[in-house]
């Protein structure tokens, strides 16, 4: 699958395109249901042919129930002078997601219990939700809150909460094998970028690249609201789970922070070894964390009755400075970070596609390489000239049990170095695929 290299080489340009998609999606007010999610899916469909699914409110999905659909047209708090002191149209984080409709006049003291701030970060608007308990509220900066004076305020939330449906999208690329790789991201957060428009845009462009390549494995891309969306998909697709070989959750991939990988619950699954091997040779700082049962949708895919090896490859992990606030905006995005995330995900996919197991066909002592002209057949180009050390590792460890990834770990070498050596040995019939 060497064709993927042209996309890796063009990652800097693609980082800018990913940013542009984030910028286009940023103004949309999304939640776990509603027209904002549908509008987001429509924009993604300009890039990849998403199949859209609608699941009716009230549908049982394991221990959960698909909630009512929420939509919002407008919301504001207006003082007696007619000034809007809080305006949803200025920032959609101003309204608690899933707020029920409100239209009343309130004093400041009556209104205060419904106003939410971050006293420690006075210039940030907090992101709040109330999905499963009917409630309403406004978020605003502490600075703005401190400016409010005793007055009568008109309070309006022009929203609807009624039977509808939950929307998710998926895109399936059929490979040579039915075994599939799951790449998933969530679509429910409103105007916040790292969490998680970065994941949405990244996975869109990963899918776009793979759609143009011939792959060994099949690939499934899932765009769904966090928690309830993955639970809904799992409950409706249990028959597909047997084909899922491994997966990754893409979130928080767009800032300038170091790369972070959260392992699967198994800790040593193939996807764990692949991601960690890629990170070892990425040339920059990274961090690997053991699994913990909170965070994003890896916790649903890792639940005992599902038990899929799904990790999460991020940059600054959730909880970063500005997380779930208005500070997670376009200014927080970093095009180089987006490009590096794209490149890293593609390198992981390259390793998944090329991690094969060989058997040495000349196992009694070392074969004579020179008479086979093998030094002229190495496949890695100028970056990987004749590499007898990599070849010795491949020949010695290719017993039909050790994969190329195993050999890369045991040798301490980059996976590509081992892979290119194996390619050369295979071409002169010193190896056969197991």
Swiss-Prot record:
Cofactor remark: Binds 1 zinc ion per subunit.
Segments for region (Insert): 56-164
The keyword NADP belongs to this UniProt entry's keyword annotation: no
Known cofactor(s): Zn(2+)
Pfam families with a match to the protein in the record: DUF2172 (PF09940), DUF4910 (PF16254), HTH_47 (PF16221)
Keywords noted in UniProt: Carbohydrate metabolism, Metal-binding, Zinc
Permutated winged helix-turn-helix: annotated span: 356-434
GO MF annotation, one: metal ion binding
InterPro entries, per database record: DUF2172, DUF4910, UCP015244, UCP01524_HTH, WH-like_DNA-bd_sf
Chain positions recorded as Zn(2+) binding sites: 189, 195, 324
Annotated region described as Aminopeptidase-like, given as residue ranges: 1-55, 57-355
Main function: The genomic context suggests a role in the biosynthesis of modified polysaccharides; this association with genes involved in carbohydrate metabolism is observed in several phylogenetically distinct taxa. Is not expected to have peptidase activity despite low similarity to aminopeptidases.
Domains as described in the record: Contains an N-terminal region with low similarity to aminopeptidases, an insert domain, and a C-terminal permutated winged helix-turn-helix domain.
Protein name (database record): Putative polysaccharide biosynthesis protein with aminopeptidase-like domain
